[in-house]
């Protein structure tokens, strides 16, 4: 039986992962909701390829999930979630500098690995490992944080584009 976790530390852990979720979802899954149309207009790439890049990122996310789970099992969630943030940042940098749609798609493959390593499933797994039978409320709170991703990030994404 897992002991009840220390409340102040637990709140810090949930808030830290929660803010990470807001940024991770907002800079990956929700990004093209705001930026696809300006990207198409400014680059001349087809909308189909821009949206397909996100789809390929999602596919990549699913494909890396078993390996991510093994790494969380072996090393814990902290290094995996941290690596996710780095991968998402690298993917976004590649995306921002993409001279053509092929590089843009490659950026989304990197982002997809970051998504697989850092969105809800790895975060929930991390909380499950940390809190055992007491993880349910932590996961609920984390989900509430993640729900603010579009509310927080869409205006930021739009502002960054202007």
Q: Would you name each region that the model predicts?
A:
Residues 25-29, 112-121, 150-151:
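Small-residue-rich segments within alpha-helical transmembrane domains of MFS-like 12-TM solute carriers
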Residues 39, 117-131:
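Intracellular juxtamembrane helix-capping segments at the cytosolic ends
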Residues 134-154:
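Glycine-rich segments within core transmembrane alpha-helices of 12-TM secondary carriers
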Residues 12-47, 64-68, 153-157:
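Extracytoplasmic
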Residues 22, 91, 102-118, 143:
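Hydrophobic core of transmembrane alpha-helices in multi-pass small-molecule transporters
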């Amino acid at each position: 039986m897992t002991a009840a976790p220390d409340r102040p530390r637990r709140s810090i852990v949930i808030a830290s992962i929660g803010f990470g979720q807001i940024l991770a979802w907002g800079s990956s899954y929700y990004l093209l909701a705001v930026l696809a149309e300006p990207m198409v207009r400014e680059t001349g790439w087809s909308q189909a390829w821009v949206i397909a890049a996100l789809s390929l990122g999602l596919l990549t996310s699913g494909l890396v999930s078993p390996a991510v789970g093994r790494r969380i099992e072996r090393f814990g969630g902290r290094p995996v979630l941290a690596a996710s943030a780095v991968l998402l940042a690298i993917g976004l940098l590649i995306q921002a500098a993409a001279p053509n749609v092929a590089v843009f798609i490659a950026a989304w493959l990197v982002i997809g690995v970051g998504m697989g390593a850092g969105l809800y499933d790895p975060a929930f797994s991390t909380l499950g490992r940390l809190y055992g039978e007491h993880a349910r409320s932590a996961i609920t709170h984390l989900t509430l944080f993640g729900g603010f991703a579009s509310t927080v990030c869409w205006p930021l994404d739009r502002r960054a584009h202007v």
